[in-house]
């Protein structure tokens, strides 16, 4: 439906607790607002169409299979619960690490977020430059790391190291 609204524009004096009446010839601006009601299914379909509109048929099929492949996995990653699975699946890039390979380094800036699909990662930390790294935890499938450095633009706090970590 269409609604009209009026907006009176005037300067106010320093006394905010008093409301003065509009001036005899106020400046009037008219505007209109309209909206259509959509169901959640309509909105999801629209988003899907927008996301897939630039893809050819083969790319659409590949994207659909990628989404199905990751859908169950992504539902187990709590930090992604509120996000659209299609958008998240589209943003994922599989990577593979060798056994013992450093994934991130403590103290370095972080610009990536990792979700473990398969395998485990040892979380290593050292308290000072003179100390050795100590394992303080292990991460496995559906665990994630790197979100704090990425979201807060801070150096990495811990440094996971792969232990047969595969995509």
Curated annotation (Swiss-Prot):
Alphabetical list of Pfam families matching this protein: cNMP_binding
Gene Ontology molecular function, alphabetical: cAMP binding; cAMP-dependent protein kinase inhibitor activity; protein kinase A catalytic subunit binding
Subcellular localization: Cell membrane
Motif (Pseudophosphorylation motif): 30-33
Cell membrane listed as a keyword: yes
Modified residues (Phosphothreonine): 12
Keywords from the UniProt entry: cAMP, cAMP-binding, Cell membrane, Disulfide bond, Membrane, Nucleotide-binding, Phosphoprotein, Repeat
Residues engaged in binding 3',5'-cyclic AMP 1: 51-78
Superkingdom assignment: Eukaryota
Residues where 3',5'-cyclic AMP 2 binds: 79-167
Entry protein name: cAMP-dependent protein kinase type I-alpha regulatory subunit
Gene: PRKAR1A
């Amino acid at each position: 439906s269409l609604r009209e609204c009026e907006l009176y524009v005037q300067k106010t004096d320093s006394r905010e607790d008093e409301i003065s009446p509009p001036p005899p010839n106020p400046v009037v601006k008219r505007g209109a607002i309209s909206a259509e009601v959509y169901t959640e299914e309509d909105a999801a379909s629209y988003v899907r169409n927008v996301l897939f509109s630039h893809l050819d048929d083969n790319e659409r099929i590949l994207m659909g299979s990628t989404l199905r492949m990751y859908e169950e996995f992504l539902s187990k990653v709590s930090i992604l619960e509120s996000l659209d699975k299609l958008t998240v699946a589209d943003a994922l890039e599989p990577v593979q690490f060798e056994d013992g390979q450093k994934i991130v380094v403590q103290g370095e800036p972080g610009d990536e977020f990792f979700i473990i699909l398969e395998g485990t990662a040892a979380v290593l930390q050292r308290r000072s430059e003179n100390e050795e790294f100590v394992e303080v935890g292990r991460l496995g499938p559906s665990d994630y790391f790197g979100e704090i450095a990425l979201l807060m633009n801070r150096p990495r706090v811990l440094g996971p190291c792969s232990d047969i970590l595969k995509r």
